[in-house]
Amino acid sequence: MTEAPSDRDPITVMGLLFETHEGLIAKLEPTWRDHGLSGLEMNALQRLSRSPGRRLRMVDLATQTGLSTSGVTRLVDRLQRNGLVVRETDPADRRNTYATLTQEGDARLGQALPEYRAAVQHWFIEQLPPDQLDSLLAALRILRDALRPEATAIT
């Protein structure tokens, strides 16, 4: 007879993580879509809005979003086509190109954020008692710092 896997079994742990992630994305995705954004675009706009000068070097945006350089180029191409960001070359070092949030991008983000914030509040924050949420957030930061320390710019 096969023994039931324990809660600490690596496959069980990852299964729970994947199921939770997929479920949360399914609940949050309509808030992005209602504003003409994908989750990745929403993430990029938030990162730009919280950065000094509302801009990031393309390489830094790639690092923070976990995208390759070609992936972030495609992302910024889409955002630029929609008037949400512009590319700017650093006059002091022409090798650096920045993605900069436009007024239209800031406005779109401002329109999407209340609904997004409410969905995160409902589907994530309110699902746990405060002490468990605090423990989860601490654990997520430990894991994030171990796995992607370069992604810490906006937390």
Task: Give the label of every model feature segment.
Residues 1-35, 82, 134:
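N-terminal leader segment of winged-helix/HTH proteins
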Residues 21, 65, 109, 120, ...:
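Short amphipathic alpha-helical/adjacent loop interface patches that line ligand
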Residues 25, 77-135:
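Charged, amphipathic alpha-helical coiled-coil/dimerization segments
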